[in-house]
Amino acid sequence: MKVIVIGATGSIGRLTVKNLLAEGHSVTAFARRPDRVGIEHSELTLRAGDARDAAAVTAAIRGQDAVVITLGAGASRRNKIRSEGTLAVIRAMQETGVRRLIVQSTLG
């Protein structure tokens, strides 16, 4: 399965990428600084972009089978990356026809 991980440079994102690769999936790691993923694998594609950038998210999601969102705001409670990024991803999925979504969140 082709899976994109949005927010792939955080601890949960990197672990998600590693586990998906170990299970035999083809993974795209999407992050502002994908060089920070720190994983090399023949089935891993690194893609730079901001989760709030609708055009970048849509382009990255096109052709994927599933999306995993592991966005985090870090220590800043004012950062709206989770809400704005998740909304951009959902809209991109609607536009591209990708139907599988997993969202990791610490909100609750």
Q: Language-model segments: what does each one mean?
A:
Residues S42-D65:
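Conserved Rossmann-fold cofactor-binding substructure of NAD(P)-dependent oxidoreductases
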Residues F30-D35, D50-A51:
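N-terminal Rossmann-fold cofactor-binding loop
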Residues K2, S26-V27, R99-R100:
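Residues at the starts of beta-strands that form the adenosine-phosphate
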Residues V3-H25:
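N-terminal Rossmann NAD(P)H-binding glycine-rich loop of SDR-like oxidoreductase domains
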Residues I69, G74-V103:
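NAD(P)-cofactor binding segment of oxidoreductase domains
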Residues D35-E43:
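Short loop/helix-cap segments at secondary-structure boundaries that form the rim of catalytic
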Residues T9, R33, L107:
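Residues in the short beta-alpha loop(s) of Rossmann-like NAD(P)-binding domains
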